Amino acid sequence: LAELRAHPGKYSFGSPGVGSLGHLNLAAMNADLKVDVLHVPYRGMGPALTAAVGGEVQVQQDQYASAQSLIKAGKLRAIAVSAPGRLAGMPELPTLAELGYPQLNALGQTWFGLVAPTGTPDAVVQTLKQAVGRALADPALVQRLATLGAQPEGGTPQAFAQRISQTLAANRKIIETAGIKLDE
């Protein structure tokens, strides 16, 4: 942090594009940590990772599943993870929360969920929920997901809807505070 603060604008952060999760996390990091790291948007994560490996950008955030081979090959250096806990595949990496940045830890978490069209009958939603619950109870599936850096949670449709709403509100605040325009 001292280096970033001593040289505002010297370091750059590659993201898969304007308005992406990586872009929003950089904006939050700049504001929360009082640093000025330049955002360099690419056309997708592949080009952004290539830029990080090639030294075009000094900071990169990506999902463990797509970056792990580059990390293990020594082409990228992992610093921390933004996850509820340490990842099974790289238990030596601390979380951002462990490093003292809990506000950034929550923002950087990528999550996936199952959605259905509005108006889907409750019986269908419950059938899907139960099927997902059974799948997530399979130790082999949980182990496979862990190798990809995923930490399955399960839950209720209501809890997932609330998580979506909270994430949208947090992202909206970052976009407004940073003045991000999606047509940049």
Whereabouts are the PLM-identified features?
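Hinge/capping helix and adjacent helix->loop/strand transition within the periplasmic-binding protein
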Residues: L1-P47, V59, L96-E98, W111-R144, ...
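Alpha-to-beta junction loops
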Residues: H7-Y11, V35, V53-D62, K75-A78, ...
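Short helix-initiation/N-cap motifs at beta->coil->alpha
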Residues: G17, V40-T50, G54, Q63-S66, ...
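Hydrophobic residues within well-ordered alpha-helices
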Residues: L26, A52-V53, I71-G74, L128
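A ligand-binding cleft/hinge motif common to bilobed small-molecule-binding domains
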Residues: A28-D32, V59-L93
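An extracytoplasmic/periplasmic, membrane-proximal ligand-sensing/linker region
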Residues: L33-V35, K72-A73, D122-E184
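Periplasmic-binding protein-like
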Residues: S82-T118
